[in-house]
Amino acid sequence: MAPKRGAAVIDLSSYKLEVSDTTASRQQGLSGRDALGSFDGMLFVFGARGLYPFWMKETKFPLDIIWLDGGVVVDVATLQPPSEEKFPATHVPTHMADKVLELEAGKADELGIKNGAYVILPR
């Protein structure tokens, strides 16, 4: 089945998003992929607010992980791919969220994305 698609507007730039809203698609995430485009991302949609930890299992490139409550940023972290000999570290957000956005590493700093910022998301 083809992945669900959406878009987000951040700092007047539009990002093409793959929407991950099932347990299977959330577990897979971006694992095994070789790269992520500069204006591409993945949006993880959860059914309820929670403290959703993220890790970089089988992820080959660094990512900015942005936790959202509604469309408001509540936490941001840049995670690196694990080395071959290490188990990937898990980052637990500081606040409850209902969505998580993954973008190319460095985008959060480049766009000034920080706690309290707004992101316009697909419905």
What is the predicted role of each segment?
Residues 1-123:
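Compact, glycine-rich, soluble single-domain proteins
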